[in-house]
Amino acid sequence: MKVVKLSHPNYEYDVHSLVKAFYAEDQVTVITPETKPEKLAELEPQVSLEIELAETGAKIRVGEEDFLWDAETENLADGYKNGLKRFLYRTLSKVTGQKLPWGNLTGIRPTKIAYGMLDEGRSDAEILDFMEQSHYVSEEKALLGIDIAKRERDLLKEIHYEGGYSLYIGIPFCPTTCLYCSFTSYPIAAFRRQVDAYVDAVIKEMDYVAENFQDKVLDTVYI
């Protein structure tokens, strides 16, 4: 288990997601000043990574080694949070010897940046450079992100924005977890007995939606 001590709860989600990407096989727990005292007492002796935040930067301690970040020497046009994520990525990359294919991007939609830059009229080369330099994304994944973003734009041109709707179907079981993903999911091996009941419930809800949205156009299905 990896226990991370964070001096402020503001960035708990981002820190947890990125640390988990580097230590995919380990349970990752983040403790902050808002963590319950009894849990702090239990986990603090197990801290393996400590992050101290300040207005002008941050300090990360891994074991006995300190890593310092002076935010004033970095162009933080995209905000403190992204600067912190770059610093944390560089630190963990150095400590583990790993480079993640999606860099410091976490979440469920790593193509969002490419999509936004295409809307701004940026060239493929500009987007590629930004994703490599600002988010440490590999060239292969950055090019994939640009390609997918272009396909998304073409598809969204056909959306019925006023008379249509989108359908989201949650599947909480995954055989594996993607490195960039922070979605809540459960290993299918441990919950296999619940799959049939869950699918039955999904079908029931789909029947309800089909009956009650007959006057609208189903544009997209997210699974």
For every predicted segment, state its role.
Residues 96-99, 119-167:
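N-terminal [4Fe-4S]-dependent radical SAM core
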Residues 185-204, 209, 216-223:
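Core AdoMet radical
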Residues 161-163, 214-218:
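Short helix-loop-beta connector
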